[in-house]
Amino acid sequence: MKTFHKLIVLGGVMCALVSCEAPKQSAQGPQMRPATITGARRIANVRTTAYTHTEKGGSRNAIGRRLSGRNVMSAASDWSRFPLGTRFQIVGTSERYVIDDYGGALVGTNTIDLYKTSRAAMRRWGVRRVDIDILEWGSKEQSLKVLGPRRKHRIIRRMIAGLEKA
């Protein structure tokens, strides 16, 4: 009986120590933090790149609509990390985006590719690490619905596997 009590006390002490531990920075990707926008979730240090409609992918997003460069702008990601329909804002700006596209180079990364309306704007953006506020998470189900018929491609299968695992 004494051993049982010692184990309970030891377990309680271990739980208290673990819960007091400071969060560790991950070398792999962004960190979640509370956001300043009500109901939003902040993700710090997100790697972003830029693309435009004159590149290989053309002027349509993954769901067949024109890429948007106004109001809520188009963005691409690995949908297993940021699903189709995810809405976010870059902290410190009024720029709001919606994930409506994906790219092969993004699969397996925490990178978001931001749509820019010209090559000059794309080059100006370059590669930046920014904090974002997630305003609304996209839909795993919608992502799978769009990706399902395209599963013959290896990168699509990787996104599907990530979505099904989540």
Feature map (PLM): residue ranges:
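N-terminal secretion targeting segments of exported proteins
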Residues: 1-26
